[in-house]
């Protein structure tokens, strides 16, 4: 009896000792998706629908990226180009709001139905383009549950030594936790492109000079003032100095003293990030704007001068989403965009990125608190802001604050084909379309500087129309051959800074995620490199799945007699 007990104890001890090791053994899948963004979830769903084993692994605790992180006022562009699973997402949103129970804080017929270039609710097409964050997150969670896709959350790629390759193919990726994932195909669906970079793939950070790809809107854009996110939008020039007009008094916070650069030149700077914060004016659901830790009212001295110079558009991008809430975006010369404080984010360590995120959160929460409480704010603006607050029923585990910052741009792959403004403007045809984009060529401000005249000004904000919807090349999803022959990159796509300004919209990321997964399965089944997937067969499959690869050319205008 004692011998049996000793044997049992010994076996249990051995089992306990081996459990952690088993936990860290490689998990093998056909397709490994790194990143739980909208593109990542859609890519995983497509791979599973095509009969493959797939896992979504990444740092995310919440699925859906920006689509579930506050960006509910969708950058739709031309909705006719949104097909496949991307369109299905917006159909599922429509189905949710088609139920009376979804309208918690207002009746459906009281909602204004405003969208970006399209009605929010498109009953004829059974789609809805505007939504609350928690609704989007539920749709993404439903996708993985329905398709029985495992999701491994809060797993961070070991960027230094976690990518193992056999020649030009990725064999496995290992997380900082020690967990390893082997796969036949890999998809980097992160906003940062961490897997892409760690795999030895070429990429770029910042703006290329216009001369690199023969563009107009890339590079430094000193003197170009689009939209109203610049200091020309107020009635008089604003001094950047602590004592107006006196350089010796020092420069106000959040203004760079560096030269902005020469028009058209490249740099390594990144367009501004912000949180797409959601607010509500329903008293029962409203959390007053909190005073953040580290709050410093001096950081907003420039904002006081903006109001003194006649700014009256504080609420210009409090865009309405259902149930008396907003998707709130940057608007104006000094707003929620934290200009100049994200330059090192794309390449930064995880710890440094956390510092950047904390600084952005402090700045943006402080901006709201300052407007709602500082006595120097115009009384009408302050009274209006005090009617708003963070919603109790959104981002419940984060005090009503979004869990995902808007990484508008980080790394961009330099891949098999580089998309530029020339394809978007129809100056050059796009080969092998795998989806379409249509949104305006859009970059937010990159820097805030002092002009030669001694005034403060912003630089980098661009809003230029495309020549209608445009195709996106398959080659922009894959690296150069020989660098990573089983990797797809549907978010940090191969494109110039300014082309990415239009491509970078959430509906397009979902389109490209589905196309990437389709091609990944085809490459795997044929035993070929991702760069060698036959275009005609891929096109056939994408069309069968409802993807839109081109629109009919407009009829030529009749000649005047």
What are these regions (language model features)?
Residues 1-5:
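N-terminal secretory signal peptides that target proteins for export/translocation
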Residues 9-23:
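Bacterial N-terminal signal peptides
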Residues 27-37:
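Beta1/beta-strand and adjacent pyrophosphate-binding region of the FAD-binding site
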Residues 40:
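N-terminal Rossmann-fold NAD(P) dinucleotide-binding loop
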Residues 47:
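Aromatic pocket-lining residues of Rossmann-like dinucleotide-binding sites
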Residues 52-53, 58-162, 204, 212-214, ...:
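Conserved N-terminal/central alpha/beta ligand/cofactor-binding core
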Residues 137, 171, 179-185, 189-560:
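Flavin (FAD/FMN)-binding glycine-rich loop and adjacent Rossmann-like elements that form
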Residues 161-180:
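Conserved beta-strand-loop-beta-strand element in the redox core of flavoprotein oxidoreductases
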């Amino acid at each position: 009896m004692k011998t049996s007990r000793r044997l049992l104890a010994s076996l249990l001890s051995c089992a306990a000792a081996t459990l952690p090791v088993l936990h860290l053994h490689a998990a093998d899948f056909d397709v490994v998706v790194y990143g739980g963004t909208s593109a990542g979830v859609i890519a995983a769903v497509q791979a599973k629908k095509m009969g493959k084993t797939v896992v979504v692994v990444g740092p995310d605790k919440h699925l859906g990226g920006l689509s579930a992180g506050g960006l509910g006022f969708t950058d739709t562009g031309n909705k006719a180009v949104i097909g496949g699973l991307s369109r299905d997402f917006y159909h599922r949103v429509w189905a949710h709001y088609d139920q009376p129970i979804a309208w918690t804080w207002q009746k459906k017929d009281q909602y204004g139905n405003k969208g970006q270039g399209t009605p929010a609710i498109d009953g004829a097409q059974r789609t809805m383009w505007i939504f609350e964050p928690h609704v989007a997150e539920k749709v993404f969670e439903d996708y993985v549950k329905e398709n029985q896709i495992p999701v491994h959350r809060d797993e961070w790629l070991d960027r230094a030594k976690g990518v193992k390759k056999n020649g030009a193919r990725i064999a496995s990726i290992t997380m900082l936790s020690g967990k390893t994932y082997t796969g036949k195909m890999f998809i980097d669906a992160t906003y940062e492109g961490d897997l892409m970079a760690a795999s030895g793939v070429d990429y770029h950070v910042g703006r290329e000079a216009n001369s690199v790809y023969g563009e107009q809107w890339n590079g430094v854009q000193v003197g170009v003032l689009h939209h109203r996110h610049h200091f020309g939008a107020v009635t008089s020039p604003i001094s950047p100095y602590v004592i107006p007009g006196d350089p010796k008094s020092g420069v106000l916070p959040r203004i760079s003293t560096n030269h902005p650069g020469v028009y058209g030149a490249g740099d390594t700077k990144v367009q501004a990030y912000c949180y797409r914060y959601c607010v509500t004016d329903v008293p029962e659901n409203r959390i007053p704007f909190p005073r953040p830790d580290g709050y410093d009212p001096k950081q907003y001295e420039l904002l006081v001068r903006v109001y003194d110079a006649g700014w009256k558009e504080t609420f210009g991008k409090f865009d309405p989403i259902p149930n008396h809430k907003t998707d709130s975006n940057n608007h104006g010369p000094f707003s929620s965009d934290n200009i100049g404080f994200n330059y090192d984010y794309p390449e930064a360590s995880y710890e440094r990125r956390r510092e950047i995120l904390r600084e952005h959160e402090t700045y943006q929460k402080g901006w709201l608190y300052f407007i709602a409480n500082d006595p120097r704010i115009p009384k009408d603006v302050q009274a209006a802001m005090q009617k708003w607050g963070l919603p109790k029923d959104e981002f419940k585990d984060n005090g009503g604050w979004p869990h995902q910052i808007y990484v508008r741009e980080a790394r961009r792959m330099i891949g098999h084909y580089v998309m530029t403004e020339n394809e978007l403007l129809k100056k050059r045809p796009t080969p092998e379309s795998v989806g379409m984009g249509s949104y305006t060529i859009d970059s937010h401000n990159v820097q805030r500087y002092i002009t030669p005249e001694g005034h403060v000004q912003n630089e980098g904000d661009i809003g230029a129309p495309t020549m209608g919807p445009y195709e996106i090349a398959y080659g922009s999803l894959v690296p150069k051959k020989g660098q990573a022959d089983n990797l797809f990159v549907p978010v940090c796509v191969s494109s110039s800074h300014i082309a990415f300004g239009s491509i970078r919209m959430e509906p397009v990321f979902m389109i490209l995620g589905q196309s990437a997964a389709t091609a990944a399965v085809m490459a795997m089944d044929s035993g070929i490199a991702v760069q060698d997937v036959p275009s005609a067969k891929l096109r056939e499959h994408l069309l069968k799945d409802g993807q839109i690869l081109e629109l009919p050319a407009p009829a030529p205008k009749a000649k005047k007699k």
